[in-house]
Amino acid sequence: MENLRRQFDLPTEDQLFLNDYGLPWETTVDGSHWVLIHNFATDERYNHPKVTAAIRLEAGYPRAGLDMVYFFPALVRTDGKPINRTEGTQIIANQTFQRWSRHRTSQNPWIIGQDNIGTHIVLIEDWLAREFER
């Protein structure tokens, strides 16, 4: 991809993780600070094998935790079963992203100094896979 936006700087550890992750990524400011990860692999049981995943960085990140994920284009299961808590949408850079309302739990809280974009992406990958366990 060409012309990847870098509208704000990420902490060094996040930049290193994203570069090593190997997918095109960018940062953009559109009401909030967003990290967009392109060509993000889903699962063959979704309607799109690759999407753009968006992560909103809350004010105070990395002390403030990351939450949820947004996908473009929107995902549906190919077996026709609904995906719970995905009804919300968010316009980011003139595209309508599907919000996946997923949250950390008291058993898996955000830990300052340990959690970052990399650990959040691991959760996103897990959310995509676990969708088919229900």
Locate each region found by the language model.
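Strand-helix-loop interaction patch of compact alpha/beta domains
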Residues: E2-P49
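Flexible, active-site-adjacent loop/turn segments at secondary-structure boundaries
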Residues: E44, A59, Q98
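Domain-scale recognition of soluble eukaryotic interaction modules
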Residues: E2-N3, G65-R134
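Hydrophobic, Leu/Ile/Phe/Ala-enriched alpha-helical segments that form helix-helix packing faces
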Residues: D14-L18, G22-W25, L57, I124-E131
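Proline-anchored loop/turn motifs at beta-strand termini and strand-loop-strand connectors
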Residues: A54-P62
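Short, solvent-exposed secondary-structure capping/transition elements
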Residues: N47, P62-L66
